Amino acid sequence: MVNFIRLFRGMRFAALAAAMLVAACANNPNDPNAAMNASASTPGSAQDFVVNVGDRVFFDSDSSELNSQARATLDKQATWLNQYSHYAFTIEGHADERGTREYNIALGARRAQATRDYLISRGVSGQRMRTISYGKERPVAVCNDISCWSQNRRAVTVLNAGGA
């Protein structure tokens, strides 16, 4: 009988330990996806801007003209930026790898400026933004193919940390 009681206590302890282990695994505070999802759901956060609004617009080859898709994204950016006016931000202009470094720096600058001008036309204060061109120096995709080049022809709106 004594052995049965010890066995029963051991089983209760094992069941309790297993339940605690399952509960601990269900909520991992070090899970980067959990932190990102929590941040993404916070209205007005930088993650909210990237995930729900979109932080970049794309351009045709050798062009700084905003197409209809870019204007639609910038309209959403303008609405968000006007609502959360405490953010200052930088517009980065980028180009694909084709062309000289100097040409692509100038093209990236025109893309950033076109993006800036459009946001200003939608009521966003020009005092909150600055532009910079990286030309072809910071590609997001590296390969000798149109699929990579099209991803690199972009302007990215980057919110400054901590707001304005």
Language model region names:
Residues V2-A15:
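Bacterial N-terminal signal peptides that target proteins for export
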Residues L21-A24:
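C-terminal motif of bacterial Sec signal peptides marking the signal peptidase cleavage site
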Residues A26-A88, A161-A164:
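Periplasmic peptidoglycan-binding/tethering modules of Gram-negative envelope proteins
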Residues G54-R56, E102, R154:
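Short, solvent-exposed beta-strand edge segments and adjacent coil->beta transition regions
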Residues S64-A72, R98, E102, A106-R110:
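Soluble non-cytosolic domains of exported or imported proteins
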Residues S85-H94, A109-V140, R153-A164:
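A non-catalytic structural micro-motif
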Residues A141-D145:
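Short beta-alpha junctions and helix-cap segments that line functional grooves
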Residues S147-Q151:
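A generic structural micro-feature
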